[in-house]
Curated annotation (Swiss-Prot):
Result, substituting residue 305 to L: Decreased palmitoylation. Loss of localization at the plasma membrane. Loss of targeting to cell-cell junctions. Alters interaction with TJP2. Loss of pro-apoptotic function
GO cellular component, one term: extrinsic component of postsynaptic density membrane
A single MF term (Gene Ontology): cadherin binding
Spans annotated as Interaction with ARHGEF7: 717-1229
Topology relative to the membrane: Peripheral membrane protein
Lineage of producing organism: Eukaryota, Metazoa, Chordata, Craniata, Vertebrata
Cytoplasm is among the record's keywords: yes
Species name: Homo sapiens (Human)
Protein name: Protein scribble homolog
Coiled-coil regions listed in the entry: 458-474, 656-701, 1379-1419
Residue ranges of LRR repeats: 37-58, 60-81, 83-104, 106-127, 129-150, 152-174, 175-197, 198-219, 221-243, 244-265, 267-288, 290-312, 313-334, 336-357, 359-381, 382-402
Length: 1655
């Protein structure tokens, strides 16, 4: 956006003006100045009332925004905007659109929403370019009948109008994608609506539709359909035709069922059918495999379909306010479910399979009839569990109990069983409640009525339905409550409870009383109970019924007293009826006893007020403390029975033996507990009574205050006391600071309690403060004489910063002092002899065994947790001043571990662990809030010392705060994995079994973490390959161990499999999880490792490089690239793909092709990409220490490769080949590709040339500078078509210098090269060549041991510049890329043949005259020799004894050389005729090798023909130049001939005096200091067409080119030709050569050699 500011001499060329939200009341005048250039004008959100005349002179406007103004009229001059594309006049007061709008022919986007329009002008439909039209909320009553003329409409918005019908022409809008008709009065849709082929969104909400046309199913591209808030009673079956539908909104209709065709909507993601009348959901819903959100709220569903379990992508299921009675067990199949809402249904039980929905975070079951929750829900990571509407917190604390009906373990809490709110069906029961209260004492009104007239018995239910149960009861007086309570207790002893669903109907009076008492529905199941054998049998059901009637019809005050109870929280709906023969204490939590006649409900009392009853500070005698700590309840009903569970501040309940319970009942003075004024007397009586009941339980109770009782061990322990000491510490500051953090200060958040002092909140482990003895929690009193008591935080910071180098600080430290008195051991009762917290799992399965002795063995563990953004991820319970976690134990315990939190990920904590110290602060006898403050301190890491009951001996782990471990000595606890050894660490059962049953020994290694590195690296994980370790059994392995690191000193080795880290199972962990487990801060790292055998062939080799010597290897593979192992595509290792015999590796002889590289100079190669491995290998010095192991066998695995390799052409390779080109690299920075027969190389593998310049390896050759900037301009030839293979591969040649003596695979033959090599040829034709010395004897070509790239001709180097050879296509001719049409080619051939005949005689005459001079320019080899050498590759005959390669057989009987596919076929036919039995090949070649041979052979054919063309061109040009200039003049060609430039020869001739290492390659001469610059070469002008570089057959047909009529271009051609071919040897050409040359075809003047074509 451009804000135009009218400055002086401002630029008048303004295209956009934005004046939105500027409170303009008129169009600014400066806008008119830009009428010639203004294209975009935005005046939205102003106060414009009219548009003046000059406004419509802005003829170039393309976008006009006038929304949110007060414009009352749109003038007809709007037709002036003939270039207007976008018009927005929404939210104005425009009453009509002018007819002249039709002249805005360019209008594409128009928005008229929010105007008081009632109709559209007749010419509006002439806006044929209109694509987006918005007419929302314009009071439109009908659409124009010809609206179909707007054929380009893509979006049509007609929301909030008065439309009652749609025109039939709407179906002509074939481009329409979005149609919004919501908020209209449509009653029926036209059938033609289904003829919109491109419609994607259809909005029909808030209309009056009663049915949808079946033609709607033809909208195959429809994505969103909204028909909510209509009157639909059914959906058409054709709805299943909407195959792309993702959103289907059917809310607020009258649907009773969904069609079965809905299962065809495979893409459906959101289905909303809330507020309908659904009685069932079709089973076909399970076929909607992509459904993620299903809303079925407020329907009449009784059950859900079983196919719901197929919806594996379902995340949100809402079935609130239905009539569900049960959930199908298949709901556990919804593994992605995260929110399940079942509020206000009739559910009595939840299926345990619900625990399979592992992603479930929110479960809402409020308003149901649940008795309990399945215990399996503890496996879920629930964030919210709603059991009631008025629930205060999203998560509750649960107890476990056994279901009396099924015997299964269930969860319960104070909100279970549920008490659903009264509904219409309960109104009849609640209506007559006033009858029960009508006989209240006359002095008080029991029920406050809201109706004037009294209600009779006959219409009580009807009146109650009208009132909806709205009554208010009078609050009883406390004195009345006491009388009522006694009456209720007396009546309970007269009758046994009756189960409502036992078969006998309850009397009406009893139903009313039950509803008044509990408000629970009649079909809820009772909670779990425990059977008491000694309980007397109750009466039968009939007797129960009679007693109930008697009890409920008793009149007067007794009824009123009975109906009122002290506020209780009910756990079941079975009310305790009068007639129970047991007296129920008020404060005693009752275990649900099962009687023969019915079930006793569990009553849970309200939590007492914190001021009532037992207070330790007000106890009159110390014996009461002993009794209290021994297990007394706050209400004093008796000790906690073993097996009871605490629920926060609430009292536990547990089944007890009948005798014990009777004893407690006899001596419990319950009546006195209600009165506050009798509190002290009640406490004394309670304590004395309990002492009498527990005779023999406590032998001697010490009369000392503050004793504690350990019920687990039955010990009376004198508590430790906290002493405070003042210390003076001196810290020597270092460059990194003091290594402490402080918290608190006056005016800041207190660090501990209400103390506003300065505290140490964090101490670095290796910092100066830690070495001086500073601890977390120390209170800072003084720093270098500056008092900090009462100081603010910033003052303390400044004091520490300005303290200088030596900091002397005075701190105040709290420490626990153990008592001197011995522990008093009390005899155990038999029923108390087991751990009361065994079943407190909370969803984590702990391998805890019941102790065999009264005092179980305890094991201490160290856990170090790093605080995450969500905290530490665990909760603690217990401590002084809090409810004990274990009865009689004031210690602090881990009570809950949040799944996915820091503690859960660490795996070192377990529920039930006792916390002994936090960050070195002893908390064994600390208060709960003190421990919380230590855990919530600002320290990022928390070190915990834990104590855990274990069955085995204690491991030798030192305490972290006693003596810090040194880094030099590693504590290692080794346990051999033999069955029956008790010394294995405490592990999960599955991990323990794996450690015991494995074939290899398992050891536990402990590494003290002193702040330094561990000295090891790992590889593998469930998401990473671990090659070469664990190929058959993946896992996490140690891939590197530093020689003198902590891991090496502890005995860890490369190849060890890590099973667990600090108790956390990492066998199936991802790589990142394993790394996080190892890096997690802790005081000691415990590793459980398995000694897996080392990879086969693991050894370390040391190779010394001579000064300037190359390493001489190439590598392949690497992470995130092409696999280097042909046997395993997932193997990301680094392998040796080539070993050059001239390098240090070849001289050493121990490295071979196929070995896997693990480390180079102590640097691991595991997990490195190909490029990183190359850089690492290139950076080594003269000494190479490499760790290798066996990889693959080059000879056997070569045939497994699908692709024969990568022929890297850095110029023609596209983005798609980047990975493959980077997967093979030479390690030597200056290494060039060498002769294919001179290296040990994997077949089909070639080197990828980097941008480095090549260097000559032979003696006498100067390095050549290769400038690829000019070559990179050569256009790519596109895809490569492979030529079908026609010949078998040759025999493998024996390398004379192979150190291992093995036969390397044969190199690629010419058949392997791609068919269109002109790009690589053109790019490489300019490489200068060298010629061997003239005195070199001619001998059959035998490849030397090594040759540098400069010693090779361009034919031999072509394969390094080819594209990747791909799989051949099926049985088709090779694709030919022709740059010249067939007609033009035929004409050129005819023309050149005619000119050739005319010039032949003249050239024969001139050839003899130019013979002497031509000898100076051409080499001395005859054309026949050239052809014979051209037809055979340099490596085709490696030795005189080896047979010729069948790729290029010699001509028979002096026939023509084989240079084309046709010639080869003819030659093979002759061979078959002469020798009917074909020779059997010595080795069957793989298809890859055959393709390589075929491609390379054809490339050599083409190169030979190209070379002969060049020589012909040179000779012909020289002859023509001589003939035209005459003898007396020296032409430019003769002058150029004197310049030193090599001439090509087709095959190599080894030179004896240069040695085998430096034999020159074919056709090259030493260049004395001559560097070839391709930039100068690419700048040479060229007009020669490129049709001479074609596919083989086409190049064979191209025979002659037209001669030159003028000498100028010939001279220029001569220059280029000599630059290309080099300087010829003097006297190298005889007259016979000239005659042979003249018999061939001349060259056209425009031809300039075969160098790269300048772009």
């Amino acid at each position: 956006m451009l804000k135009c500011i009218p400055l002086w001499r401002c630029n008048r060329h303004v295209e956009s003006v934005d004046k939105r939200h500027c409170s303009l009341q008129a169009v600014p005048e400066e806008i008119y100045r830009y009428s010639r250039s203004l294209e975009e004008l935005l005046l939205d959100a102003n106060q414009l009332r009219e548009l003046p005349k000059p406004f419509f002179r802005l003829l170039n406007l393309r976008k006009l925004g006038l929304s949110d103004n007060e414009i009352q009229r749109l003038p007809p001059e709007v037709a002036n905007f003939m270039q207007l594309v976008e018009l927005d006049v929404s939210r104005n007061d425009i009453p009509e659109i002018p007819e002249s709008i039709k002249f805005c022919k360019a209008l594409e986007i128009a928005d008229f929403s929010g105007n008081p329009l009632s109709r559209l002008p007749d010419g509006f439909t002439q806006l044929r370019s209109l694509a987006h039209l918005a007419l929302n909320d314009v009071s439109l009553q009908a659409l124009p009948g010809d609206v179909g003329n707007l054929a380009n409409l893509v979006t049509l918005e007609l929301r909030e109008n008065l439309l009652k019908s749609l025109p039939a022409s709407l179906s002509f809008l074939v481009k329409l994608e979005q149609l919004d008709l919501g908020g209209n009065d449509l009653e029926v849709l036209p059938d033609t609506l289904g003829a919109l082929p491109n419609l994607r969104e259809l909005w029909l909400d808030r209309n009056q539709l009663s049915a949808l046309p079946p033609e709607l199913g033809n909208l195959r591209r429809l994505v969103c359909l909204d028909v909510s808030e209509n009157r639909l009673e059914e959906l058409p079956a054709e709805l299943g035709g909407l195959v792309l539908l993702t959103d289907l909104l059917l809310s607020q209709n009258l649907l009773r069922r969904l069609p079965d065709g809905i299962g065809q909507l495979k893409q459906l993601s959101i289905l909303k059918v809330d507020q309908n009348r659904l009685c069932e959901v079709t089973e076909a819903i399970g076929d909607c495999e992509n459904l993620s959100e299903l809303i079925l709220t407020e329907n009449l569903l009784m059950a859900l379909p079983r196919s719901l379990g197929k919806l594996t992508k379902l995340t949100n299921l809402n079935v609130d306010r239905n009539h569900l009675e049960a959930l199908p067990p298949e709901i556990g199949g919804c593994v992605a479910l995260s929110v399940l809402s079942l509020r206000d249904n009739r559910l009595a039980v939840l299926p345990p399979e619900l625990a399979h929905t592992t992603e479930l975070h929110v479960l809402d079951v409020a308003g149901n009839r649940l008795q309990s929750l399945p215990f399996a829900l503890t496996h879920l990571n629930l964030k919210a569990l709603w059991l009631a509407e008025n629930q205060a917190q999203p998560m509750l604390r649960f107890q476990t109990e056994d279901d009396a009906r099924t015997g299964e373990k269930v969860l319960t809490c104070y909100l279970l069983p549920q008490q659903p709110p009264p509904s219409l069906e309960d109104a009849g029961q609640q209506g007559s409640l006033s009858e029960t209260w009508s006989d209240a004492p006359p002095s008080r009104v029991s029920v406050i009525q809201f109706l004037e007239a009294p209600i009779g018995d006959e219409d009580a239910e009807e009146a109650a339905a009208e009132k909806r149960g709205l009554q208010r009861r009078a609050t009883p007086h406390p004195s009345e409550l006491k009388v009522m309570k006694r009456s209720i207790e007396g009546r309970r002893s007269e009758a046994c409870p009756c189960q409502p669903d036992s078969g006998s109907p309850l009397p009406a009076e009893e139903e009313k009383r039950l509803s008044a008492e509990s408000g629970l529905s009649e079909d809820s199941r009772p909670s779990a109970s425990t059977v008491s054998e000694a309980e007397p049998e109750g009466p039968s059901a009939e007797a129960q019924g009679g007693s109930q009637q008697e009890a409920t019809t008793a009149g007067g005050e007794e009824d009123a007293e009975e109906d009122y109870q002290e506020p209780t929280v009910h756990f079941a709906e079975d009310a305790l009826l009068p007639g129970d023969d047991r007296e129920i204490e008020e404060g005693q939590p009752e275990a649900p006893w099962t009687l023969p006649g019915g079930r006793q409900r569990l009553i849970r009392k309200d939590t007492p007020h914190y001021k009532k009853h037992f207070k330790i500070s007000k106890l009159p005698q110390p014996e009461a403390v002993v009794a209290l700590l021994q297990g007394m309840q706050p209400d004093g009903e008796g000790p906690v029975a073993p097996g009871g569970w605490h629920n926060g501040p609430h009292a536990p309940w547990a089944p007890r033996a009948q005798k014990e319970e009777e004893e407690e009942e006899e001596g419990s003075p319950q009546e006195e507990e209600e009165e506050e004024e009798e509190e002290n007397r009640a406490e004394e009586e309670e304590a004395s009574t309990e002492e009498e009941d527990k005779e023999g339980a406590v032998v001697s109770a010490p009369s000392v205050k503050g004793v504690s009782f350990d019920q687990a061990n039955n010990l009376l322990i004198e508590p430790a006391r906290i002493e405070e000491e003042e210390l003076t510490l001196t810290i020597l500051r270092q460059t990194g600071g003091l290594g402490i953090s402080i918290a608190g200060g006056k005016g800041s958040t207190p660090y501990k309690g209400d103390d506003e002092g300065i505290f140490i909140s964090r101490v670095s482990e290796e910092g100066p403060a830690a070495r001086a003895g500073v601890r977390v929690g120390d209170k800072l009193l003084e720093v270098n004489g500056v008092a900090l008591q009462g100081a603010e935080h910033h003052e303390a910071v400044e004091a520490l910063r300005g303290a200088g180098t030596a900091v002397q600080m005075r701190v105040w430290r709290e420490r626990m002092v153990e008592p001197e008195n011995a522990v008093t051991i009390t005899p155990l009762r038999p029923e108390d002899d087991y751990s009361p917290r065994e079943r407190r799992g909370g969803g984590l399965r702990l391998p805890l065994l019941p102790p065999e002795s009264p005092g179980p063995l305890r094991q201490r563990h160290v856990a170090c947790l790093a605080r995450s953004e969500r905290g530490l991820g665990f909760s603690i319970a217990g401590g002084k001043g809090s409810t004990p976690y274990r009865a009689g134990d004031a210690g602090i315990f881990v009570s809950r571990i949040a799944e996915g939190g820091a503690a859960h990920r660490a795996g070192t904590l377990q529920v039930g662990d006792r916390v002994l110290s936090i960050n070195g602060v002893d908390v064994t006898e600390a208060r709960h809030d003190h421990a919380v403050s230590l855990l919530t301190a600002a320290s990022p890491t928390i070190a915990l010392l834990l104590e855990r009951e274990a069955g085995g001996p204690l491991p030798p782990s030192p305490l972290p705060h006693s003596s810090p471990p040194t880094a030099a000595v590693a504590t290692t606890s080794i346990t051999t994995a033999t069955p029956g050894v008790p010394g294995l660490p405490s592990l999960a059962p599955s991990l323990l079994a794996a450690a015991l049953e494995g074939p290899y020994p398992v050891e536990e290694i402990r590494l003290p973490r002193a702040g330094g590195p561990l000295g090891l690296s790992i590889v593998g994980g469930s998401d990473h390959s671990s090659h070469p370790f664990g190929v058959q059994e993946p896992g996490v392995f140690i891939s590197k161990v530093l020689p003198r690191g902590l891991a090496a000193r502890s005995g860890l080795r490369v190849g060890d499999r890590i099973l667990a880290v600090n108790g956390q199972d990492v066998r199936d962990a991802t790589h990142q999880e394993a790394v996080s487990a190892l890096l997690r801060p802790c005081l000691e790292l415990s590793l459980l490792v398995r000694r897996d055998p080392a990879p086969p062939g693991l050894r370390e080799l040391c190779i010394q490089k001579a000064p300037g010597e190359r390493l001489g290897i190439s590598i392949r593979g690497g992470a995130r690239g092409h696999a280097g192992n042909p046997r395993d595509p997932t193997d990301e290792g680094i392998f040796i793909s080539k070993v050059s015999p001239t390098g240090a590796a070849g001289r050493d002889g121990r490295l071979r092709v196929g070995l896997r590289l693990l480390e180079v100079n102590q640097q691991s190669l595991l997990g490195l990409t190909h490029g990183e491995a190359v850089q690492l290998l290139r950076s080594v010095g003269d000494t190479l220490t490499v760790l290798v192991c066996d990889g693959f066998e080059a000879s056997t695995d070569a045939a497994l490769e699908v692709s024969p390799g990568v022929i890297a052409n850095p110029f023609a390779a596209g983005i798609g080949h980047r990975n493959s080109l980077e997967s093979i690299s030479s390690i030597d920075r200056e290494l060039s590709p060498e002769g294919p027969g001179k290296e040990k190389e994997l077949p089909g593998q070639t080197l990828h040339w980097g941008p480095e310049a090549t260097e000559a390896a032979g003696r006498g050759l100067q390095p050549l500078k290769l400038d690829y900037r000019a070559l990179a301009a050569v256009p790519s030839a596109g895809s490569v078509q492979r030529v079908p293979s026609g010949a078998a591969g040759g025999k493998m040649a024996e390398s004379p210098c192979s150190p291992s003596g093995q036969q390397p695979p044969s190199p690629p033959s010419p058949d392997e090269l791609p068919a269109n090599v002109k790009q690589a040829y053109r790019a490489f034709a300019a490489v200068p060549t060298s010629h061997p010395p003239e005195d070199a004897p001619a001998q059959p070509p035998t490849p030397g041991p090594a040759a540098s790239p400069e010693q090779l001709s361009f034919r031999e180097r072509q394969k390094y510049f080819e594209l990747e050879v791909r799989v051949p296509q099926a049985e088709g001719p090779p694709k030919r890329v022709s740059l010249v049409g067939a007609d033009d080619l035929r004409k050129m051939q005819e023309e050149e043949a005619r000119k050739l005949q005319q010039k032949r005689a003249q050239m024969l005459r001139e050839a003899a005259e130019a013979g002497a001079e031509a000898r100076l320019a051409l080499d001395g080899e005859t054309l026949g020799e050239e052809e014979q050498e051209d037809e055979q590759p340099p490596w085709a005959s490696p030795s005189p004894t080896s047979r010729q390669s069948p790729a290029s057989p010699p001509p028979l009987g002096g026939g023509a050389p084989v240079r084309t596919a046709k010639a080869e076929r003819r030659h093979q036919e002759r061979l078959r005729v002469q020798s009917p039995e074909p020779p059997a090949p010595e080795r069957a070649l793989s298809p890859a090798e055959l393709r390589a041979l075929e491609a390379e052979k054809r490339a050599l054919w083409r190169a030979a023909r190209m070379k002969s063309l060049e020589q012909d061109a040179l000779r012909a040009q020289m002859v023509l130049s001589r003939s035209q200039e005459g003898r007396g003049t020296r032409g430019p060609l003769e002058r150029l001939a004197e310049a030193p430039s090599p001439a090509p020869t087709p095959s190599p001739t080894p030179v004896e005096d240069l040695g085998p290492q430096t034999s020159t390659s074919p056709g090259r001469l030493p260049l004395s200091g001559k560097k070839f610059d391709y930039r100068a070469f690419a700048a040479l002008p060229s007009s020669r067409p490129v049709y001479d570089i074609q596919s083989p057959d086409f190049a064979e047909e191209l025979r002659s080119l037209e001669p030159s009529p003028s000498p100028g271009p010939q001279e220029e051609d001569g220059e280029v030709a000599l630059v290309l071919l080099g300087r010829p040897s003097p006297g190298a050409v005889g007259p016979e050569d000239v005659a042979l040359c003249s018999s061939r075809r001349p060259v056209r003047p425009g031809r300039r050699g075969l160098g790269p074509v300048p772009s």
